[in-house]
């Protein structure tokens, strides 16, 4: 077992005479360092100064004399004062009383340096003992030891040198060992510091000891060292492998980064080329559309500005195509009048039949005789026109057949002219729409193909509303066409009105963004251009809306209309199955897009600006409050939306069911069921919808009774009697491959006739 300390070896008692009476340069230097040492703070401790001044003057004198003797001995002189003699006389007793704090250098393992120091110290101790024996009588006569005059905190009667830290006393402190019993109080002042108050005080360091016991042998240590070396080699090898792998990965990253930069550059070139080609194509389309519009201005007509008093209005003037059709129609009418006149003349030349041949002659003769009697003369001076020569019966029938054929031909020509006129009217509607679009596009600030949000390249204007413009755009990131709706606020609006409009648009964006259904137009993105302009990016559809189709074709077949209604109801069912449910509230033909532009294709619902969210807070048993009364399209809203009272009316998804019925009626008959030729203001003033208690069906075109019954269920006046969206989705009329065969309730499914169902069946019969 080995005990180590930082202060040196402490196996034996220290030799006080080595410090006090043996004049060595090391001891003198140690004394000077002790006297001149200052604590880390840089000034002597106040407690040591107070204790020094509180000493007896005699004790202070003895202490000074003792350390003066040490300094004198270190210079090598042989003379000493009486105080130094006294100190050397008490050398042995001081050494024995020092205890475990002495130096253990006498007990250390023999080394060349230590042997020399011990031999020199031994010779000095012998000389010192001779001096002590020669002066023993004078010192021993006093009867007191110098340690009796000191009270040191480390123990009564101990030598002042014992308070000196071992690191100062022992010159071999860095190579010595100590026992576990050696300890130094860190805060105990030393007598040296007390004796010299004007010098800095040494701050002793706190010592720590560690006792270690082991049974390791050299073989085990060698094995451990070998194992550690092997582990170290493995770790170094692993580190080298990882460094090489890291270098490889860094090289791969650099290669991939270069490749990525190359692809990015190539992608940017492709995007730039795509933009260039799209702009060229759009420019050519704009030029061709304007050329075609100029040609159609002469053929179909154009707008002219007409002054009425102090104001100017635009008036439509038909082109030569309509003028030619009008002339042809006038010629047909004139030909018809001529044929009718000739038919009347032919009737006068109709030959008499055999039974009636005498009667007309007798009558004529009687008239002639009467005329002569009145005139009084038989010779008439006036030339009378000859009576038309009567035709034979064959000639009469021949002429009559010719006139009938001519009338039939004129009727056919008139029908063709009417059909051509209707076709030209449809083309004229497109032409008028294109003229307005071109005019709006020329006045738009986005006409020069800008790229919005560094992503959407605007191509051409699709349409314009009250406060918004819709452009066909190309998404450069997703490489697809899109419809960008640009909302522009009026700069003269108050900030409150702008905030309300923006809040309304953000609400529409939040509602529409969460919807994902094949029958609903998708909303891709939303961003702002400035404080007064923001955009929404929607799915682009090639075709027109249902309203434009109805204006072009007036109506459609029942199969086509039923297909459109089925898709609308499917989308409404989705809106009512999500949480929270949504009421569209603005269903109309203008908000139903025909993907292919025909009635036999897919449809998509758009425009959720007036939608209502049926959350738990606002929706109750009777529905939710209508907070935006007066908004919407009046022809397609139910009667409960027009009720005025102290409290707002309650609405539910049955509002959309009413709209479906109106749209279905308009598709079948080409007109609206209520307020067809009225404006919204007239509908509101005359309470047209509030009076719409029952729907009336025209005689033509012919529509099935099942379709009429379906419309009645949708247009029930009381909302309690009206179907909701879920009931409407399960209506037998909309179920696929099912038709009503007769009024008894038979159903045909895929060509098979089903048996009549009892009244208690789940299938509703009408």
Curated annotation (Swiss-Prot):
The gene coding this protein: Tlk1
Protein's GO biological process: chromatin organization; DNA damage response; intracellular protein transport; intracellular signal transduction; protein phosphorylation; regulation of chromatin organization
Tissues in which the protein is found: Ubiquitously expressed in all tissues examined.
InterPro entries: Kinase-like_dom_sf (IPR011009), Prot_kinase_dom (IPR000719), Protein_kinase_ATP_BS (IPR017441), Ser/Thr_kinase_AS (IPR008271)
Catalysis: reaction(s): L-seryl-[protein] + ATP = O-phospho-L-seryl-[protein] + ADP + H(+); L-threonyl-[protein] + ATP = O-phospho-L-threonyl-[protein] + ADP + H(+)
Function, as annotated: Rapidly and transiently inhibited by phosphorylation following the generation of DNA double-stranded breaks during S-phase. This is cell cycle checkpoint and ATM-pathway dependent and appears to regulate processes involved in chromatin assembly. Isoform 3 protects the cells from the ionizing radiation by facilitating the repair of DSBs. In vitro, phosphorylates histone H3 at 'Ser-10'.
Enzyme kind, highest EC tier: transferase
Name of the protein in its database record: Serine/threonine-protein kinase tousled-like 1
Compartments where found: Nucleus
Alphabetized GO MF terms: ATP binding; protein serine kinase activity; protein serine/threonine kinase activity
Species whose genome carries this gene: Mus musculus
Regulation: Cell-cycle regulated, maximal activity in S-phase. Inactivated by phosphorylation at Ser-743, potentially by CHEK1.
Cofactor(s) needed: Mg(2+)
The keyword Transmembrane helix is assigned to this record: no
Active site per UniProt: 586 (proton acceptor)
Region: Disordered, residue numbers: 1-198, 344-381, 745-766
Similarity comment text for this entry: Belongs to the protein kinase superfamily. Ser/Thr protein kinase family.
Ranges in a coiled coil: 229-280, 397-445
Biased composition (Polar residues): 87-103, 353-365
PTM sites of type Phosphothreonine: 38
Pfam families associated with the record: Pkinase
């Amino acid at each position: 077992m080995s005990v180590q300390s930082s202060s040196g070896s402490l196996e034996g008692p220290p030799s006080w005479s080595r410090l006090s009476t043996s004049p060595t340069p090391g001891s003198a230097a140690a004394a000077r360092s002790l006297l001149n040492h200052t604590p880390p703070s840089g000034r002597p401790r106040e407690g040591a100064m107070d204790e020094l001044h509180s000493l007896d003057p005699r004790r202070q004198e003895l202490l000074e004399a003792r350390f003066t003797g040490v300094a004198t001995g270190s210079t090598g002189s042989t003379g000493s004062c009486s105080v130094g003699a006294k100190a050397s006389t008490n050398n042995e007793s001081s050494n024995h009383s020092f205890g475990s704090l002495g130096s253990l250098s006498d007990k250390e393992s023999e080394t060349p340096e230590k042997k020399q120091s011990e031999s020199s110290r031994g010779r000095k101790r012998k000389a010192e003992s001779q001096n002590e024996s020669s002066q023993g009588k004078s010192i021993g006569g006093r009867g007191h030891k110098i340690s009796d005059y000191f009270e040191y905190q480390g123990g009564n009667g101990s030598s002042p040198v014992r308070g000196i830290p071992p690191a100062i006393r022992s010159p071999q402190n860095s190579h010595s060992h100590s026992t576990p019993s050696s300890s130094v109080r860190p805060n105990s002042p030393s007598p040296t510091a007390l004796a010299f108050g004007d010098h800095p005080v040494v701050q002793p360091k706190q010592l720590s000891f560690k006792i270690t016991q082991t049974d390791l042998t050299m073989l085990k240590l060698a094995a451990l060292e070998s194992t550690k070396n092997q582990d170290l080699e493995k770790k170094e090898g692993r580190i080298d492998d990882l460094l090489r792998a890291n270098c490889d990965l860094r090289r791969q990253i650099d290669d991939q980064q270069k490749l990525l930069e190359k692809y990015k550059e190539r992608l940017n070139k492709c995007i730039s080329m795509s933009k260039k080609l799209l702009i060229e194509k759009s420019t050519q389309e704009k030029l061709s559309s304007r050329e075609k519009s100029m040609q159609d201005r002469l053929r179909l007509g154009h707008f002219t500005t007409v002054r009425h008093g102090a104001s100017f209005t635009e008036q439509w003037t038909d082109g030569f195509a309509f003028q030619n059709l009008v002339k042809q129609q006038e010629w047909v009418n004139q030909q018809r009048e001529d044929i009718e006149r000739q038919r009347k003349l032919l009737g006068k030349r109709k030959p008499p039949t055999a039974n009636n041949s005498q009667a007309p002659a007798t009558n004529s003769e009687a008239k002639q005789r009467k005329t002569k009697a009145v005139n009084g003369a038989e010779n008439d001076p006036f030339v009378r026109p000859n009576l038309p020569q009567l035709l034979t019966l064959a000639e009469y029938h021949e002429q009559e057949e010719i006139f009938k054929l001519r009338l039939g031909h004129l009727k056919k020509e008139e029908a063709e002219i009417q059909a051509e006129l209707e076709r030209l009217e449809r083309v004229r509607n497109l032409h008028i729409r294109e003229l307005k679009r071109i005019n709006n596009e020329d006045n738009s600030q986005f006409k020069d193909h800008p790229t919005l949000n560094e992503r959407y390249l605007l191509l051409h204007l699709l349409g314009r509303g009250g406060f918004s413009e819709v452009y066909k755009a190309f998404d450069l990131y997703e490489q697809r066409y899109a419809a960008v709706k640009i909302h522009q606020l009026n700069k003269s609006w108050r900030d409150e009105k702008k905030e309300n409009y923006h809040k309304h648009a953000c609400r529409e964006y939040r509602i529409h963004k969460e919807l994902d259904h094949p029958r609903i137009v998708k909303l891709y993105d939303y961003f702002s251009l400035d404080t007064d302009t923001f955009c929404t990016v929607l799915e682009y559809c090639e075709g027109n809306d249902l309203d434009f189709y109805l204006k072009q074709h007036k109506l459609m077949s029942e199969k086509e209309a039923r297909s459109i209604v089925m898709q609308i109801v499917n989308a409404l069912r989705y809106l009512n199955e999500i949480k929270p449910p949504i009421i569209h509230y603005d269903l109309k033909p203008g908000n139903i897009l025909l993907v292919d532009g025909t009635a036999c294709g897919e449809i998509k619902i758009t425009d959720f600006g007036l939608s209502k969210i049926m959350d738990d807070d606002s929706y109750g048993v009777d529905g939710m409050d209508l907070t935006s009364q007066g908004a919407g399209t009046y022809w397609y809203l139910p009667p409960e939306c027009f009720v005025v009272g102290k409290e707002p009316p309650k609405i539910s998804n049955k509002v959309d069911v009413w709209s479906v019925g109106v749209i279905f009626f308009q598709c079948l008959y080409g007109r609206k069921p209520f307020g067809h030729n009225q404006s919204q203001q007239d509908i509101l003033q005359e309470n047209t919808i509030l009076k719409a208690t029952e729907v009336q069906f025209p005689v033509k075109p012919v529509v099935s009774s099942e379709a009429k019954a379906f419309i009645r269920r949708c247009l029930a006046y009381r909302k309690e009697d009206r179907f909701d969206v879920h009931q409407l989705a399960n209506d037998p009329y909309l179920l696929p491959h099912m038709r009503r065969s007769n009024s008894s309730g038979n159903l045909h499914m895929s060509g098979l006739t089903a048996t009549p169902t009892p009244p208690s069946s789940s299938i509703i019969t009408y």
